[in-house]
Amino acid sequence: MRTEYCGQLRLSHVGQQVTLCGWVNRRRDLGSLIFIDMRDREGIVQVFFDPDRADALKLASELRNEFCIQVTGTVRARDAKNVNADMATGEIEVLASSLTIINRADSLPLDANHVNTEEARLKYRYLDLRRPEMAQRLKTRAKITSLVRRFMDEHGFLDIETPMLTKATPEGARDYLVPSRVHKGKFYALPQSPQLFKQLLMMSGFDRYYQIVKCFRDEDLRADRQPEFTQIDVETSFMTAPQVREVMEALVRHLWLEVKGVDLGDFPVMTFAEAERRYGSDKPDLRNPMELVDVADLLKSVEFAVFAGPANDPKGRVAALRVPGGAQLSRKQIDDYGNFVKIYGAKGLAYIKVNERAKGLDGINSPVAKFLTADIVDAILERTGAQDGDMIFFGADNKKVVADALGALRLKLGKDLSLTDEDKWAPLWVIDFPMFEDDGEGGLTAMHHPFTAPRDMTASELKTAPEEAVANAYDMVINGYEVGGGSVRIHNGEMQQTVFGILGINEQEQREKFGFLLDALKYGTPPHAGLAFGLDRLTMLLTGTDNIRDVIAFPKTTAAACLMTEAPSFANQAALTELGIQVVKKAENN
């Protein structure tokens, strides 16, 4: 039906007769001439109808936005004064000789100027996806998956599918359960990841595996989360953690070079401890120049319990955050930032405004100055590198609260004061995470997942001091987003059972949930390691959007609903009866 795409016509096509198929993006009726912007997935081209082709001109008078049409015509160069530099096809236009209206469109539920609520965009997603910027994002996503497949194939990885209907295993989030009709009362789970299957593939001898795969997690959503999402899933045998990182870094550098024309260079490597200490986050945004600086040793003897208490507490921390040019902040802005850090558990926000450093105490403005000597202030300013016109904010509490509060404040200030370089790419690897973290109930939970191997510890050493264990794990972070994470896996049965025990999984439960894995570990399991990238998040970064729903064709809302199909929906009673399921209505409060 077509010979060319609208958006691909150029000066090289001048004089050629072409047939185009697409939609009316905009129509301008000048009486004797009618112009339309005609759109398809590749872009927009201007088509015009003149009186010499009377039949086509008459039919064109009926055109309205989003009519689906076919046009045959001749490509012509535009006059110099009519060239549109903002359009890829702006140097040419098509003189139509014939027009076919394939399908008409009713009045549109979406605003023609694209000023629409997200609810409307999701309800009429098939119309929203016609917008050039949305089409471009999905085209970029397709390009990314194609580049990934070629790269992985060239590096000896095998694309192997793993099951969608599997067994529920604890991986940190709730499972989506699927009832079995044949085995009444039993349920499959949709996979949160192919984690165990890809490890079993390594045990099967496949050596290098990858898969672009759907995963499912029934968890509370955020702007960058979806209940179903896509992973670039990778596993290798006989490769060390640095070797895995080298290959995966090469993949990401390849993507950025091909999609953005940007060479990311070598990725720096930073430990979890350093990232938390300097940036208050395990996924630091290195485009932001501000860093947290420890000053507890300078404040142990001050007559100010807010500082002295945490400074003398082994579990406490006092840190300073220098804000270049921050002395310009008003009292209201400072109060607003003080309220902001309370979200993260901080009790408030002490500060020092540096007006004229050379004047010592007389050159600063601070509500805590009366508790500080000139020497202490000078030492703080020296350590933080403060200059005239800067602001120093303080965090004083337990280590987690200080890291969370100042880390979040750092990001907010970086954005609010334009200190973060939005035109820069800042990738890094974060390694050496704690193996376990406090579950808040007196026990431990795996920071990554229970199949991650510890660094340089035997099973007996791990059992003796689990809180000291460092995981042989690694995350890739770009511009403050965790885009991928992985680890070296446990390939020893004793170690795996030890980890399960530390996590409070008794032997009976181990056999019930992971018996197949424990059995497989008995038969010559190779050392193996892997990683998974979030394809949605990678695409989000590569297309420059901050909303993950913009890079998924048919996403869910933050309430995990599809407004277009109205899923989830109630099942009919016959289907429920066949499955042996009874829906229990929630009791109403009297």
Curated annotation (Swiss-Prot):
Enzyme class: ligase
Region (Aspartate): 195-198
Statement: the UniProt record of this protein carries the keyword ATP-binding: yes
GO biological process: aspartyl-tRNA aminoacylation
InterPro entries assigned: Aa-tRNA-synt_II, aa-tRNA-synth_II, aa-tRNA-synth_II/BPL/LPL, Asp-tRNA-ligase_1, Asp-tRNA-ligase_1_N, Asp/Asn-tRNA-synth_IIb, AspRS_core, GAD-like_sf
Residues annotated to bind L-aspartate: E171, R217, H448, R489
NCBIfam families hit by this protein: aspS_bact, PRK00476.1
Known role: Catalyzes the attachment of L-aspartate to tRNA(Asp) in a two-step reaction: L-aspartate is first activated by ATP to form Asp-AMP and then transferred to the acceptor end of tRNA(Asp).
Name of this chain's protein: Aspartate--tRNA ligase
Organism: Salmonella agona (strain SL483)
GN (gene name): aspS
